[in-house]
Amino acid sequence: MNIAHAVEQAGLRPTDIERIVVGIGPAPFTGLRAGIVAAKALAFATGAELVGQDALSPQTQLVDEYASDDACHLTLAINDARRRQLYFMLMDSARGSAMPRTLVGMDIDYPQSIVRRVDAAVELLRADRPNVRYVVDVVGHGASKYAMTWDSLAALGSVSDDTLLDKGAYGLERFASFATSDESLARPVPVEPLYLRRPDVSVPNPLKHVLNHAGADKTE
């Protein structure tokens, strides 16, 4: 995207920008870092406030759009992390608050392991409130890819590949509104990339010494 062209199309000047919202992941390394660096540079150049927002928490808003029954809908927000893994987070947004309650914190794991962890969290909720019917809605990139795995969830609701960031201007507005709500701004997060996966690069082991080898001597 040409940022200067987008600003011009909106009838604005760069100095009119007061706040910039940037996604901080979790996502793969290269694209995530490039986006954050661009946002930081633009904020520095314009003097705009810079706000970071993770990609998973706002997904509760998508579930709220079609959760019309009397069940307590929990959101399993996911994002494809490649290598048959998913970034994920389990949240409960049906508590009269704009900020969802985290039930399983943001992490990376294999789909089968995610199912076990989510089922364990739901069991704890049921033990505390046995008369409540809980439903887990799975939403985000990778949801349909692992649809057969989600079938083993004890309280499966809907499964959707939707994300707010796929919905054009409407989705971006919802994403930004979530990031700039009073509750979000009261708990600012560092504008740094969320990778979650451990780096592949490791420090190599030192070279082994050959037994009884004193090394080469320098000759004149």
List the predicted regions and their residue ranges.
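Acyltransferase
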Residues: S158-E220
